[in-house]
Every structure is written in C-alpha cells, then in structure tokens.
Amino acid sequence: GDIQAYILQLKDFSDKAFTIFEEDLQRDDRLIWLSISQGRVQELCSSLLEINNELDNGLYQHVSSLIMVSATLTVGESFDHIIRRCGLSRYQQEGRIRTLLERSPFHYEEQACLLMVDDMADPTREPEQFSYQVTEALLNIAETVKGRVMALFTSRKMLSEVSGLLRPLLKGSGIALLVQNEDGDFAALMDGFVNSEKALLMGLETYWEGVDLKGDLLKCLVVVKLPFRSPSDPYASAAEKYCRLHRLNTFNYFMLPDAAVRFKQGIGRLIRSEDDRGVAIVLDSRITRQPYGKVFQNSSPISNQVIISRKEIAQQVERWT
C-alpha cells in the first residue's frame, strides 16, 4: 500500500515537472524557480506573475458580488494597484467597483510618531558606510529605549554585517541581541524577546508581517531599508522581464507598489492596540530624498512624521518611548 502511494506521488511530481519544463517555460507570465537547501534541491516551483485571468475565470464570473477586505489594499491612499493586479480594471471601467478606505481605530496621532533620518549614507551606493551608520543608530536607539526594539532588515548580508559590528558593542549593556539565523528560529526569538526585559530583535522578511507585540512589548520599530526586492529575487527578476516584454515601467508597475505594501505591513507591527505607544524610525534616507519617498510616507498609517538627523535620534526617540 505504501509503495503504491509513493509510486503515485512520484508520478504526480513527474507530471508537474513535465508541465513546468514543457509548457510553463514558454510563457512570459510564469515564474519558475528552484528551492535549494544545503546544496540539495528541495522544490521545483512555478507561479503566475499575473493572476487576473485566473481570478476572472475562476471567481469573478461565478459570483454576483464580492467583498475584499484587508489593511494593505491601498498604495498611498489609492486602490489602483490592487485593482490592476487582481484583474478588476474591466469591472472598474464598467462602474461595478466600489472602494471604501476606513480609518484605523487607533489614534496614531497620539500613539505614535514616524521618524525619518535624512542624513544616512545611500544604502545602494555606499553599503559599507550605511552598515556602520545603521550599527551606530541601533546602538543609540537600544541604549535610549533600554530594549524593546525590533529592527527590520531586507538583506541577509547586511543583517549579518550589522550583527557582527553590534554584538561586541552591546556586550555588558544588559541588552540581549536576538538575531534571525544566529540566535534561534522564529519561535525561539519571539519567546526570547517577549521574556527579556531588555532586548533588540533583528530580523528579515518573516518579521515584516504576522508579528503581534501588544502593549509595552514593542516600543520602537526600526525600518533599516525601504523593502524593495533585490534585483536577484526570482519574482523581481521575472517581473522585470514581463514588464520589458509588455513595455511597462518595472519600477512604477511592480517594484514601487510592492515595496510600499510591504512597508505598510512592517510599520503596522508597532501599534497593535488602542493602548500602545511607540516610535517607528526609517534609516533609509531615500524616503525623504527621492521623489518616490512620498509614496512610502503616504502609505504609513502614522500621520506624525518628522524628518531628523542622526544626531537627533536619541532625543526624538526618548520623547515617544
């Protein structure tokens, strides 16, 4: 019985692999990638870049009405991105789409502040200098807040660099440094953070969403870099190819709205109840220096937004924690 089940399972895998290599590879709207762990292939994956036709044929045409609810449907305050990505443009043109943007029940103007540091090195042009400045800023923040700080990174390399610089500086401070991939898995790090009076948690994509730290558990959230996907990211690479073939601007069509939604999700980790209070800090100066920075500013649920210099970090953080 078990052998027969394994044979059927292998046949299923074989059929799917054949479909991917014989059919999906020919399509420009497909992303195909291998998941590799410790030098061994774990998964062969295929995913659609655009799901609008599938949603239309499999869902929209079979219902008379549909309600989509989420905290991250908008970029800035516009629904255009989600309407386009979900294949609803035709229905919008027919006047069949209604949108509603409800304000948060939280009083962000009283509960939180978004600090944007505008004199950091450019993370793309001066990555080494940026890492040093991030280390200095995190040390400053952790010592000011006395722990209860979570820093969100976008790059494993930078996370490792900053961790290596910061760990000896925090030695003897009483502040526990908890770093993804170094100090335990997600559950262990979250448990350590919750049960430590003074802790600085540094993590990657997993921590940008799905983390719920209410009350005094999180006083300061640090966004190290704006969460643009790396050009080497399979999805970003495939999107770039797709946009090029369809003569679309990759940055405006995909990269910017994708990053803005992830940014909103990350900032949303700070205030989780009506009693929370805290400060969010963006260490990527592109949020103030680049024209597209306004998209991120407008995507933040925090309306109190202050532009500061590096030397003002401690003073401003102290005001809100």
Per-region residue spans from a language model:
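ASCE RecA-like P-loop NTPase motor cores
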Residues: 1-321
